[in-house]
């Protein structure tokens, strides 16, 4: 399933987050390891100062696996279905693991690119790196 994640970097964690991204250790140990870096590269900082990204998650509970990794740096303010569950082939049972080959993530990310500014660019300017 796809989720639209809204989150704020925890106060004082900006440099640590940037270091984890630059060293490619963000999400290390998770089954979704590389996705964390991709999410941060695609994330947008919106006018309400939340970072937003589209997350692919196969867990029965949204972000069950990913949440502890994200919460090390972020306060997750909202996690919502990014599209109609009835239309998700993985979710409705018509095609297990369909999210891996579905184009809905790309479509959602393209839509998200039209909002805010690149999150990493903003994070670098805040940390002066």
Can you say where each PLM-predicted feature lies in the sequence?
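Short S/T/G/P-rich N-terminal loop/turn motif that feeds into the first structured element of a domain
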Residues: 1-51, 56-70, 90-129
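Macromolecular interaction modules
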Residues: 72-74
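Conserved short beta-strand edge segments in small beta-sheet-based binding/regulatory domains
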Residues: 36, 76-92
């Amino acid at each position: 399933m796809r989720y639209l994640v809204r989150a704020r970097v925890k106060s004082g964690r900006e440099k640590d987050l940037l270091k984890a991204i630059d060293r490619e250790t963000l999400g290390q140990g998770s089954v979704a390891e590389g996705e964390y870096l991709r999410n941060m590269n695609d994330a947008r900082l919106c006018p309400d100062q939340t970072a937003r990204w589209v997350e692919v998650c196969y867990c029965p509970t949204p972000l069950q696996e990913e949440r502890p990794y994200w919460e090390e740096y972020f306060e997750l303010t909202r996690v919502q279905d990014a599209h109609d569950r009835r239309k998700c082939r993985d979710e409705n049972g018509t095609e297990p693991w369909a999210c891996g080959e579905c184009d809905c993530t790309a479509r959602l990310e393209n839509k998200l690119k039209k909002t805010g500014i690149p999150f990493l660019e903003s994070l670098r300017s805040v940390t002066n790196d």
